[in-house]
C-alpha cells in the first residue's frame, strides 16, 4: 500500500513538472502527442525544399601531371575530377605494395592536393587507395633509412608530415574513402582527413612499435581526440587491428557501407557537402582544427577571417583611401555590439 501511495505521489509530481514546462495554449491532448521529430520527418521536410541528393553515377576525368622535368604523368597516384561536379579524387596507385607511400608518392599527392585547392570548381576531395585490399599501409619499409624514407638517388625525408599538415590546412573538405587496410602511416592519413567512409572490409590500426617507428604528432594527438586517451594508448601500445564496425563504434570513422557501395556513398556525401556554403565550410574546418593545431590553427582561422573581411565595404574603404592618398572614412560603418 505504501509503495502504491509513493508511486502515485511521484506520478503527480511528474505531472506538475510536465504541465509547468508545456507552453500556455497547449491542450493535454496535444501535450501527450508532443515528441521529438524523427529523422525521417526531418528528411522529408528538407527534401521538399532541396530535393533528393542525386544518385547518378559519377563520370571521372583523369587529370594529367603538370610538373617537373620529363615526367608528364603521375606515377604513384591517379588524379581525377568529376565531370561537371565539384569533386576531385586522388588515388594512391601502388597496390603491389598495399599502397604504401614513398617520397615520390607524397610529392605527387601534395601536387594533386595543391591543384585541387587552387581549382575553384572543386569543393570536395576524396583520398583513397587503388583496389580493395588497402587504402594505405603507411611508409614503404623497404625504402626506410636512418634519415627517413628515400627514393633511389634521393635524400631521406619524412615528407608525409608535410602532407598531413597540408590536408589539415586545405580549406576544402577531404574525405578518406577506405577499403581494406588503413594501417600505420595510412591510418594517420585517414585520421587527418575531415571525414572517413569505410567499406565493410576495412581494417584500422597502428603498426609503428612493431617495426621500430611511431608518430608522436598528429598520429597521437588526433587519435586521442577521436577515440579518447585510453583507447589511443591501447591502439599504439598493443598495435592491434580493428574492424570497420569496431572503428565506427569508437568514433574513429563516420560510417560503414558494403564494399560495392563505397564510392557511391562517398560521392553522395560529397554532393551533400557541395549543396552548402563553401565559405561556411571553409571557416568551420579551420575552427574545428584550430583547437588542436595551436598557433598554426589560429593562423588558419585568422586568415579565413581576413579573406572574409577583404570582401566588405569597410575593408574596401581602407584600401581605396590608401590608393587615393586620402584619410579613410570609417564613421559610416556600424560598431556592432
From Swiss-Prot:
Pfam families in the cross-refs: ECH_1
PROSITE patterns: ENOYL_COA_HYDRATASE (PS00166)
Enzyme class, UniProt record, top EC level: lyase
Reaction(s) catalysed by this chain's protein: 2-succinylbenzoyl-CoA + H(+) = 1,4-dihydroxy-2-naphthoyl-CoA + H2O
Effect of residue 20 to V: Loss of peroxisomal targeting
Residues carrying the site annotation Important for catalysis: 215, 310
UniProt binding sites for substrate: 97-98, 133, 137-141, 181-185, 207, 213
Textual note on the cofactor: The hydrogencarbonate anion plays the same catalytic role (proton acceptor) as the side-chain carboxylate group of the essential 'Asp-185' found in actinobacteria, archaea, bacteroidetes, and deltaproteobacteria.
Any one biological process term the GO annotation gives: menaquinone biosynthetic process
Nucleus listed as a keyword: no
One Gene Ontology cellular component: peroxisome
Compartment(s) of residence: Peroxisome
Keywords associated with the record: Isomerase, Lyase, Peroxisome
Binding of hydrogencarbonate, residues: 206-208
InterPro entries, alphabetized: ClpP/crotonase-like_dom_sf, DHNA-CoA_synthase_MenB, Enoyl-CoA_hyd/isom_CS, Enoyl-CoA_hydra/iso, Enoyl-CoA_hydra_C
E.C. numbers: 4.1.3.36
GO terms assigned for molecular function: 1,4-dihydroxy-2-naphthoyl-CoA synthase activity; isomerase activity
Cofactor (UniProt): hydrogencarbonate
UniProt record similarity statement: Belongs to the enoyl-CoA hydratase/isomerase family. MenB subfamily.
Complex formation: Homohexamer.
NCBIfam families: menB, PRK07396.1
Purpose: Involved in the biosynthesis of phylloquinone (vitamin K1). Converts o-succinylbenzoyl-CoA (OSB-CoA) to 1,4-dihydroxy-2-naphthoyl-CoA (DHNA-CoA).
Protein name in UniProt: 1,4-dihydroxy-2-naphthoyl-CoA synthase, peroxisomal
Biological source species: Arabidopsis thaliana (Mouse-ear cress)
Upper taxonomic lineage: Eukaryota, Viridiplantae, Streptophyta, Embryophyta, Tracheophyta
Recorded name of the encoding gene: MENB
Amino acid at each position: 500500500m505504501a509503495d502504491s501511495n509513493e508511486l502515485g505521489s511521484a506520478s503527480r509530481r511528474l505531472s506538475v513538472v510536465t504541465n509547468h514546462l508545456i507552453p500556455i495554449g497547449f491542450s493535454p491532448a496535444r501535450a501527450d502527442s508532443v515528441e521529438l521529430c524523427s529523422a525521417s520527418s526531418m528528411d522529408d521536410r528538407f527534401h521538399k525544399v532541396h530535393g533528393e541528393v542525386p544518385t547518378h553515377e559519377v563520370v571521372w576525368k583523369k587529370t594529367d601531371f603538370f610538373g617537373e622535368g620529363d615526367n608528364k604523368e603521375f606515377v604513384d597516384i591517379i588524379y581525377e575530377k568529376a565531370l561537371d561536379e565539384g569533386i576531385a579524387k586522388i588515388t594512391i596507385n601502388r597496390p603491389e605494395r598495399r599502397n604504401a607511400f614513398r617520397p615520390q608518392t607524397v610529392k605527387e599527392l601534395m601536387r594533386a592536393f595543391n591543384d585541387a585547392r587552387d581549382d575553384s570548381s572543386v569543393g570536395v576531395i576524396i583520398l583513397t587507395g587503388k583496389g580493395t585490399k588497402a587504402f594505405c599501409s603507411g611508409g614503404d619499409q623497404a625504402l626506410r633509412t636512418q634519415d627517413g624514407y628515400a627514393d633511389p638517388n634521393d635524400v631521406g625525408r619524412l615528407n608525409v608530415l608535410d602532407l598531413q599538415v597540408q590536408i589539415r590546412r586545405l580549406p576544402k573538405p577531404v574525405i578518406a574513402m577506405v577499403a581494406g587496410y588503413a594501417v600505420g602511416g595510412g591510418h594517420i592519413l585517414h585520421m587527418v582527413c575531415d571525414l572517413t567512409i569505410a567499406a565493410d572490409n576495412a581494417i584500422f590500426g597502428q603498426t609503428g612499435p612493431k617495426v621500430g617507428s611511431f608518430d608522436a604528432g598528429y598520429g597521437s594527438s588526433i587519435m586521442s581526440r577521436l577515440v579518447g586517451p585510453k583507447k589511443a594508448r591501447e591502439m599504439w601500445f598493443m598495435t592491434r587491428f580493428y574492424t570497420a564496425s569496431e572503428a565506427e563504434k569508437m568514433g574513429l570513422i563516420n560510417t560503414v557501407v558494403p564494399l560495392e557501395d563505397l564510392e557511391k556513398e562517398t560521392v553522395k556525401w560529397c554532393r551533400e557537402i557541395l549543396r552548402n556554403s563553401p565559405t561556411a565550410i571553409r571557416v568551420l574546418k579551420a575552427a574545428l582544427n584550430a583547437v588542436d593545431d595551436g598557433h598554426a590553427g589560429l593562423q588558419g582561422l585568422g586568415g579565413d577571417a581576413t579573406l572574409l573581411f577583404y570582401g566588405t565595404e569597410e575593408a574596401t574603404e581602407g584600401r581605396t583611401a590608401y590608393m587615393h592618398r586620402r584619410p579613410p572614412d570609417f564613421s559610416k560603418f556600424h560598431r556592432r555590439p
